[in-house]
């Protein structure tokens, strides 16, 4: 039975001696009740006052009209909490008038403002009310006096006897811990047995409200008061609930309880549902999740929940801490056990054949499964014969039924899941039934189990070896090569070893760590993917480039037919020449029309004819020293350079010798670059005869590399305020930014290190950007027929030195490696030194040439 707390409340009109009160308590339990005249008058006054209180009140504005007025003339229902003090004074005056002024035990009321439950109440404390809104107002209106006395007494309590068990209440029926209280009220806490005549009013309330919150009330964590754990708040709520219960039930029983319990007997206050009453403990609000919480309560609730979750997480980490660091015990010094590589590796050891995770039947082939089943059947027959003597003690019918059921239900599962052949285990004798001793029973069982273990281990070893022998042919090539060299036994190669050995490392070397191997393989595969993507992109660009070249070749012929010297044709030609070089069929014709128009004025008027110079050479005896110089020039500037092919026809060398001799005896004489121009034009299919080569080389030297162009090149490239000085404003070019390294002669050193295709492409670009619009500004033979070359050059020759300067800047910024400066570039002994790079692959060579021309175009646009 749940312990009930009986609180005796002595009226504040009397002051009892503690000893006398104990005696009176014992007498009241055994004697009938007697009332004096003063006591009857006080009970009648109390009854009228309680009857005048309203049954229920709402917190709305209409509560003022429905409230009644007590005998003292004050409105109790609508008064403020601070008015309780005046109400107490009025009550004391009435009591003094009834009992008389001679009573020395009448206490003096202390002016303490009562504590209102409205400021901290979080849920209803009323039991029988129909609406929730009336709960707080009713309990406040009817329990002002009792709540004042309860709050004052709560501050003076020392011991809370309510939470003691019923067993102590039986042995100690009357325990009244007293303490001097403040003047105004005395609170006595007494434990008594249940009396029907004393608690007829309050027992029903207690039995109604105790079962709902029995566990929470019995827990001392529900309220905390300094020095009084869980006592004051419970007493206050009990007083408020019982007063509310009495005021709401207007019956004779109520009047009887009011008259008897108010004056003579202590009030029994019910235990009500008080989730949070004057307590700051977080544990109080945790069980009441349906209660509307204040912000501070929600904060403490979240804080408590976070602390609990953190404790659980720490507890789980501490629980599994040892399992996470098991591998640390395997380390010896600085060497991890996983890096021990010189021990033969096998998938299953002799002690691990019982584990099911490492042995997977599904990886075995159908033939091996059938072979294992045949071996299993044969050995089962042998084992059955050997253990026939021990099986006689068991019922044959049970053995047949059990073995058949076991074989039919577990045969497939045993082969797939278990490494042990449990059906090979013979039925053992039953101790106590079969005539077999305990020692014999244990020996037979151990013998049978040992045979099963040995047989299972042998069978697994045979199956693994047979599987390895069949998978020898499917091993990687690295293992086969190692086996042929005597470094590997293919029968010892297991799946674990296949996983440990990397394909990028020989099998006889120590295996890499798993994480390292995984990381390196990932990086290798990533680089391979990038390389493959780059190669695919290059192939795509190469295909697009081939299509573009075919289109440009068609455009060349179309522009030539339309008129290459037109302004529109010339502008379009200057665009596509950076993408595709001129083809051999149209190169000679385009060169001639762009530099001297269709009438070939320069060739006819200002260049010596090939026949005249040839006749002059045949008539004269060419000087030997001059011939020696020409041979040295061919060997140094042609045969030792990258563009010279070892399989070059000797006729080309002899023709080059002849053309250089002719040039040396002509009016212009030998100039820088003649040997390279003659050699490349002789080896190219664009120029068929020596005459065409002679005329074209002289035409290019007189127009594109004239004296005026060379002078501008030498002066502008060294201009400290020019774009070249801005681009070359680096410490690396400090020693070569001078006239000795940067001039028109060293410019030809760049062309010495280019192959034939790039050299011809460079000539195409230079000639196209030196072309003139002869369609709009034609050249008339009559005007310049009798004029000197200098006059014609000043009128009709374009000096485009920027195309030469941009080529120099491109080489210095992007291809300046392997040499100190352009002057020393011609003295390099490496024949394979090439600009941009040396390669024998024609596809790669074309790609490099495209990149070179793109950079050249970039710097040319900056200089324009």
Swiss-Prot record:
InterPro entries for this protein: Sbe2/Sbe22_C, SBE2/SBE22_M, SBE2/SBE22_N
A single BP term in Gene Ontology: fungal-type cell wall organization
Positions of post-translational Phosphoserine modification: 82-83, 450, 532
Biased composition range(s): Polar residues: 72-84, 213-222
UniProt biased composition (Low complexity): 51-71, 123-139
Any one Pfam family match given in the protein's UniProt record, by short name: SBE2_N
Chief location bin: Golgi
UniProt keywords, alphabetically: Cell wall biogenesis/degradation, Golgi apparatus, Phosphoprotein, Protein transport, Transport
Keyword Protein transport: yes
Entry's localization field: Golgi apparatus
Region (Disordered) location: 16-84, 123-142, 213-235
Superkingdom: Eukaryota
Entry GO CC: Golgi apparatus
Bias kind Basic and acidic residues: ranges: 17-26
Entry similarity comment: Belongs to the SBE2 family.
Function: With SBE22, is involved in cell wall integrity and polarity processes like bud growth, through the transport of CHS3 and UTR2 to sites of growth.
Protein name: Protein SBE2
Organism: Saccharomyces cerevisiae (strain YJM789)
Gene that produces this protein: SBE2
